Amino acid sequence: MSYENLANLIFPNIDKTPEYYFEKYPKRDLKEGAKVLRYAPSPTGFQHIGGVFASLINERLAHQSGGIFYLRIEDTDQKREVEGAIDDTIKTMHNFGMDFDEGITGENSEKGAYAPYKQSQRADIYRAFVKDLLRKGLAYPCFMTSEELEALREKQIAEKLTPGCYGEFAKYRDLSPEEAIKRIEAGESYVIRMKSPGNPEKRVVAHDMIKGEVSFPENLQDVVIIKGDGLPTYHFAHAIDDTLMRTTHVIRGEEWLSSLPIHLQMFEVLGVEAPKYAHIPTIMKMDGSSKRKLSKRKDPESAVSYYSEKGYPSQSVIEYLLNIINSAFEEWRAENPDADYHDYKVELDKMSKSGALFDLVKLNDVSKDVICKMKPEVVYDLYTNWAKEYDKEMYDLVTSKEAMMKEVFNIDKEGPKPRKDFAKWDEVREKIFYFFDELFDKETANDVELPKTLELEEAKRIIEAYEKAYNFNTDKDTWFSDLKEVAVELGYATDRKKYKKNPEEYKGMVSDVAGAVRAALTHRANTPDLYTIMQIMGEEAVRERI
């Protein structure tokens, strides 16, 4: 009996070798410096902002180097799989401007020469590599029951020892092939563990592309590589997949940093080169005066659906995330206001080593900048696409007056300081409702925002006087001259210096008169340019309201 017999008993139908797969999945023919990266989620839930953050880093590094960005689905834990999670991942990344060069394209479809890209369909590949390790005596079947493992763990903790299956506690590590075969033939359950070559006296030193040099004790654990159900553990599948798919860089959350010694050791035992690693900081948020991890349970903004429902343009979210990835992006954007964000080069060594702080106020500022640069036609299209799903009443109203709405979305946009009225589409209704009688007529007296200097009766007198003077067919300068004439007749100042010098001689400023007109037409104290609003509304609508 030998290791060969043991390997053949465990995997009787596996006739392929690692060499076969190395030939089947050759090195990629890419230019020097091109990076191959992946987004590799587990389909155990719907996408969150941390996933978009990680995916964006991988996508930018791949594509800015002329490389490959692919989607792999890590579905070895099929009990936790959520229906629709794969399609949600693909849709989410597409909506945020990230399309995969290869990999999974749907629940049951994929593209690319390194398929399959779903781990549950790669079982025979993993088995071929495990069979090879068994042949070489580098892995072994472990027959410890869950009860034995729990008892061992309790004993180790009581004795203040590191819990786990290693060294003297690896009960079946040195079991002979003959004895292992007997147990398997007797029907005993088992997992397969890799024999760790780790030395308790040594440390593993590695270069993390974000954190710099990192150092850990070598891994001593004989980690499970094939579970009782025959599927690989994440650790082993990751090593095999990244090797065969020719991944050059693995960018993942810093919660995986402690697993780095295990993964580097696996590549060593497999006899293959490890990819380069970078561990990105956890997304944090301020909670009072302290920081904490962004929570799927506590924080609605952790879910990608939050940004769709609120109506943040995907470009806004991307540009905000680029700010988190590299703080230098903000300066670059200021210097290149009209450039495509793809022109910015993401650099890992300039990324914060500590937690990335997520700030909705900052996101809103970024989003206002993004939207204010959009052409009115683009704003119209994006807004109506959003409203069709999330605000059907506004969708019907806005699309019924398409030409007018494109004018509305262009108010005060073409000057040196364009208005920044909204950060997300759910704010649009409040900003433009007064263009629609259907919404304006629902307002009550309590909704009307008068200038603080005016009482209601005085505002009514102003409107009565202005109604007589109003002329639709004038340019802006003439319109303002007419407004000032009304102001003077009613005792309001048109010169701020004179008003400040003798305020008791006037009821107020011409701005108060304009404020009364604004309130009559819009019910709001703060709107875009009043003359432009009136021209867009049209003479009939204006006269009806004043």
Curated annotation (Swiss-Prot):
What are the GO cellular component annotations?
cytosol
Map motif 'KMSKS' region onto the chain.
293-297
Q: Give the residue range of the signal peptide.
A: none
Coarsely, its chief localization is cytoplasm
How would you classify this enzyme at the top EC level? ligase
What InterPro entries does this protein map onto? aa-tRNA-synth_I_cd-bd (IPR045462), aa-tRNA-synth_I_codon-bd_sub2 (IPR020751), aa_tRNA-synth_I_cd-bd_sf (IPR008925), Glu-tRNA-ligase_bac/mito (IPR004527), Glu/Gln-tRNA-synth (IPR000924), Glu/Gln-tRNA-synth_Ib_cat-dom (IPR020058), GluQ/Sye (IPR049940), GluRS_core (IPR033910)
Q: Select a single GO molecular function from the record's annotations and give it.
A: ATP binding
Q: Where is this motif: 'HIGH' region?
A: 41-51
Q: Which residues bind ATP?
A: 296
Question: What EC number(s) would the UniProt record show?
Answer: 6.1.1.17
Catalytic activity of the protein: tRNA(Glu) + L-glutamate + ATP = L-glutamyl-tRNA(Glu) + AMP + diphosphate
Location relative to the cell: Cytoplasm
Q: Which UniProt keywords apply?
A: Aminoacyl-tRNA synthetase, ATP-binding, Cytoplasm, Ligase, Nucleotide-binding, Protein biosynthesis
What GO biological process term is on the record, naming one? glutamyl-tRNA aminoacylation
**Disulfide cysteine pairs (residue numbers):** none
Purpose = Catalyzes the attachment of glutamate to tRNA(Glu) in a two-step reaction: glutamate is first activated by ATP to form Glu-AMP and then transferred to the acceptor end of tRNA(Glu).
Q: What does the annotation say about its assembly with partners? A: Monomer.
Protein family per UniProt: Belongs to the class-I aminoacyl-tRNA synthetase family. Glutamate--tRNA ligase type 1 subfamily.
- Protein name in UniProt: Glutamate--tRNA ligase
Recite the lineage of the species. Bacteria, Bacillati, Bacillota, Clostridia, Eubacteriales
